[in-house]
Amino acid sequence: MGSQKNYLSDDSTGGGFGVLFKWTKDALFGSRITPSRKYKEFAQDDTNYKIKRSVGKSAVGRRSRSNSWSGLDSSFYQKYDLLEDEDEDDDEKVFGMPSHLVGSGGSRSCNGDDIVGKAVPFGLDSQRRKRLQSLLDPVDLHPMREDVDTFANNLKFHNTSKLDSFDDLMQTPRQDKEFISKLFGKDTGNEPEPMSYRQFPGKFPSPGKNPTSSTKIKQVDHTDEYLQLLDKLDKNSKMIDSLNREVQNKKQQTKLQESNYKNKYMQTRNELINELRHSKKLYDNYYKLFQKYQQLKIISKESLELQNRIPTLDDRLVNETLVKDRKINELQKRIQSLQIANENLTTQREIDILKYESRIKELEAKLILQNDVHSQFHHSTSTYNNNNEFLNTDYDIDTLDTSFSRHLNINNTNYKP
């Protein structure tokens, strides 16, 4: 299919003779490059290329003067099977190094006697390298399935990737149309046409056979298949429409489901929020009760400790009461003894007082008697002076009182309960 067609299936060439005629005409008039001419030109190009690379390696490299052919597009060379002028600095532009440092590892190696395996420059683009390698291949210059008819290719050249117009679709398809042949799974280009006696040299028509029937080419009509294909396309379009409707219905159903799910989600969310609030209240109450429980636990622990201390305190209290009772008894005994001593002292003091009073009375009586006696024998003045001197020397009331008080103080200090 495409570029790989059998040359016998070409209607414009007239079969194998047409191909031979084209090759002969191209070889004589030079309108088409024949395989032998391509090989000769390749040999010359290879020689020029090697010379050019050897010159490019020298320090002083020459560059050809630019002409009107140097600015042409690559499509022009591809259209007429021409080789583009190579630039000696292509390798430096591609790899950033001199051309003599670029190896031949990227070139396609050939078997044995390949004279161009190391001559293809690595710096060229892939399309130019493939085209140059196909031209320089000495093993198979033109495959059998490659169409070399220039005029037929120019007539049939069109972009098969683009869809034809509606008028072309409604027409009966051609036998060699690539789109139809791919749809039906048939390779029309590979099917050889029935050959007639006119295609062979020295062949004459047989008198018993109808020359028109033998030379008539069988035409296959694909109209029914084409209509069936259109019916299938129509059915497929209807199925696509139904699928679109189903998809739209499913989208609407999914939207309704999403809205229902959203409402249910909001309901469950509100319920969850309420439950969370209720659980928060429960937790707060539980926390308060737990704190109270901790406090009661501490109080109970303290109460147990106090209860454990009660027996010891009772024992201590009993001991202290006993000690206090003993002290009280001792104090009471001491009080009694002191009271007895006090009574004794009071009685003794009273006795002493009575003694002192009686003594004082005696002394006063003596004094009176002495005063009466002196008054009789002496004058009043002299008796008075003598009485004063006697009082001053023999008896003094102040000294008597002080001695009595001193005696009382000594008795009080000596008494110890």
UniProtKB/Swiss-Prot annotation:
Primary location class: cytoplasm
Keywords of the record: Coiled coil, Cytoplasm, Cytoskeleton
Keyword 4Fe-4S: no
Compartmental location: Cytoplasm, Cytoskeleton, Microtubule organizing center, Spindle pole body
Transmembrane segments annotated in the record for this chain: none
Stored InterPro entries: Bbp1_C, Bbp1_N
Pfam families, sorted: BBP1_C, BBP1_N
Tagged with keyword Nucleus: no
Coiled-coil regions listed in the entry: 228-372
GO cellular component, one term: cytoplasm
Assembly and interaction partners: Homodimer.
Function: Component of the spindle pole body (SPB) required for insertion of the nascent SPB into the nuclear envelope and for the proper execution of spindle pole body (SPB) duplication. Connects the central plaque of the SPB with the half-bridge. Required for proper localization of CDC5 at the SPB and for proper M-phase progression.
Protein family according to the UniProt entry: Belongs to the BBP1 family.
Name of the protein in question: Spindle pole component BBP1
UniProt organism field: Vanderwaltozyma polyspora (strain ATCC 22028 / DSM 70294 / BCRC 21397 / CBS 2163 / NBRC 10782 / NRRL Y-8283 / UCD 57-17) (Kluyveromyces polysporus)
Name of the gene: BBP1
